[in-house]
Amino acid sequence: MSLHDAYHWPSRTPSRKGSNIKLNKTLQDHLDELEEQFTIPTELLHRVTDRFVSELYKGLTTNPGDVPMVPTWIIGTPDGNEHGSYLALDLGGTNLRVCAVEVQGNGKFDITQSKYRLPQELKVGTREALFDYIADCIKKFVEEVHPGKSQNLEIGFTFSYPCVQRSINDASLVAWTKGFDIDGVEGESVGPLLSAALKRVGCNNVRLNAILSDTTGTLVASNYASPGTEIGVIFGTGCNACYIEKFSEIPKLHKYDFPEDMNMIINCEWCDFDNQHVVLPRTKYDVAIDEESPRPGLQTYEKMIAGCYLGDILRRILLDLYEQGALFNGQDVTKIRDPLAMDTSVLSAIEVDPFENLDETQTLFEETYGLKTTEEERQFIRRACELIGTRSARLSACGVCALVRKMNKPSMIVGTDGSVYNLYPRFKDRLAQAFKDILGEEIGSKVVTIPAEDGSGVGAALVSALEAKGKALTSDILAEHLKN
């Protein structure tokens, strides 16, 4: 549960007309400095987007840079005629989800799902224990949802961990994240590990036929519900995007003899954009977060825009000003020294505080952190949140606009998901404004984000359906089309 979920807000009627309070000189000077560091002017948006476009092109060659542009091997999108029952498996950090999706065509579907807790010991145990547990959950689910069914059921596996994907059904784990630390999986293809476990538990009527990321599922599910969607994006705890590309535009795949006008969904994996620190305007707070992270020097773009980091940026700003004697008047700040003390929901709550004197923010700091705040301090904190949130949205827009420019389309529907996009106040409006600032009013206003369908559930089932229809490339098919 987030801090925002756990916090009980006052029930009295809000009254916010805008505060006329003036900050003292010290706080105002600090605010001016923050505004200079965090404001992303239009000229900088253009430079970041230009750099992004060049990295997209580079990633499609045999010598990619910071944005690897990973082929998903999905060569088609839903055409509305998909029908049938498909399974989906979503392996998260704390839960395992199994879904049965009845695909009904024309954007319609019916979903039944169950969640299973992942015991902590499985996340640090053996690979057999993990995959046997997953297979057993699938078996129990199938017995409940499809009792007595003997014919094979295809299952799509949403495996949102860094992978090298060699075909739709062959993905090797590069490195565990999300608290997993299991020997014998990194460097291995996860498909055979799951298939072997299904056999061990006697689940013989389930066939794994597709492995995908949640971002890929987001695009496919959104395209099914809203035909014409050609980009899928996640702005949540992390960030990523995928899009539909022409085979002729992917030089690193020209060793295969596929038609040049064939489409392929490309998974950008753009969290590492600008690891060389050429254009992104990092502050000292961004640098500190990077240096103290488990992967210093990597994920530069993600660390500036993703929900996993926004709360920590605010926390570091407040501690910095406390150390300089500008905030909290010598109070005990032990609670905000905890690196996990602030998540993005704290910024959201402060930005939507409806009271003129920011009463809810005052109560939040007193009850959660044991800190009394003056109205001046609360106004400063609120403005800091706005700066952090706005920077996130504007830099997020650069990646989307780079894809729009790369695809050279006059308009674009973007299936979008993630907690920041769905829950952060004014993020969508700030994103839309940045589209116009980057692409111009005419084109920018035609880049439309829509709430995505369930990518890791419905999307995985649909990818499984696409594979069954020959719209995704297996290892055998790729071997047949490899040029001599």
From Swiss-Prot:
Positions of the UniProt region annotated as Hexokinase large subdomain: 213-454
SUPFAM superfamilies registered for this protein in UniProt: Actin-like ATPase domain (SSF53067)
Result for mutant: S213N: Increased affinity for D-glucose
Record's protein name: Hexokinase-1
Gene name of the record: hxk1
Its EC number(s): 2.7.1.1
Binding site for substrate: S160, Y161, T177, K178, S213, D214, N240, E269, E302
Catalytic reaction equation(s): a D-hexose + ATP = a D-hexose 6-phosphate + ADP + H(+); D-mannose + ATP = D-mannose 6-phosphate + ADP + H(+); D-fructose + ATP = D-fructose 6-phosphate + ADP + H(+); D-glucose + ATP = D-glucose 6-phosphate + ADP + H(+)
